[in-house]
């Protein structure tokens, strides 16, 4: 399944943040967007995830413009976890993960046997079985982020979009989340597209790094190709 960004421009109000961006996301890998604050990383992720309408250009998923997909149809192929997300504190981890089954459910009834099986397997994959009946509000920051990632996985998407999944976490939890993402990519073959600020974390797990600056994509390559002094000076001024 192929994902292409074709000549996309996007912004907010009178401000243009992306200008004519083109990108092909390789299937089955981990691609990470990096760049300075305000470079358009999260904006590009939102456009791909259909949370923001582009001003020009289009996103093409599996040979079809993403705007042609119905909400449920798209949710079976792509899941996005924004940087900020909230749930009522009394909701249990198991219930939160069950919400991820919405594209596969009929109506608003109880989870089917198939749904429950997917929830069970997802809790195992994300090492959350012991927390199934714990209210989300009682979890640590790292545990809570794993629960949200588990909810997106319960959609059984082919593409997983993560906007700064390590934000507000301590160093240990940041590494735990990145290792979880790497493990899910290897086990499930799911394509991951994410935004990260930390270059060490990005280098640790990414197959491809994409740098953004001045509304454009500036570089695309492996971590070894991108994390070179001249490129870091260009993108970050360091």
PLM regions with names:
Residues 34-36:
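The feature captures the beta-strand-to-loop junction immediately N-terminal to the Walker
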Residues 49:
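Helix-to-loop junction immediately C-terminal to a conserved catalytic motif
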Residues 57-65, 74:
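Conserved ABC transporter NBD signature motif
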Residues 110, 135-139, 143:
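Conserved ABC ATPase signature
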């Amino acid at each position: 399944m192929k994902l292409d960004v074709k000549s996309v421009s996007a912004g907010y109000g009178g401000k243009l943040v992306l200008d004519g961006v083109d990108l092909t996301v390789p299937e089955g890998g981990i691609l990470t967007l990096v760049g300075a604050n305000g470079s358009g990383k999260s904006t590009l992720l939102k456009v791909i995830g259909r949370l923001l309408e582009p001003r020009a250009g289009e996103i093409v998923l599996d040979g079809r413009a993403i705007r042609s997909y119905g909400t449920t149809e798209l949710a079976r192929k792509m899941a996005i976890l924004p940087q900020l997300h909230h749930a009522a504190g009394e909701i249990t981890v198991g219930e939160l993960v069950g919400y991820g089954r919405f594209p596969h459910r009929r109506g608003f009834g109880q989870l089917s046997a198939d749904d429950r099986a997917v929830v069970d397997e997802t809790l195992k994959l994300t090492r959350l079985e012991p927390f199934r009946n714990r209210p989300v509000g009682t979890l640590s920051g790292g545990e809570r982020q794993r629960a949200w990632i588990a909810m997106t996985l319960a959609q059984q998407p082919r593409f997983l979009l993560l906007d700064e999944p390590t934000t507000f976490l301590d160093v240990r939890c940041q590494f735990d989340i990145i290792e979880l993402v790497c493990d899910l990519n290897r086990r499930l073959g799911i394509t991951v597209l994410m935004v990260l600020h930390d270059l060490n974390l990005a280098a640790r797990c990414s197959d491809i790094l994409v740098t953004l600056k001045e509304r454009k994509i500036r570089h695309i390559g492996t971590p070894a190709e991108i994390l070179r002094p001249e490129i870091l000076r260009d993108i970050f001024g360091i």
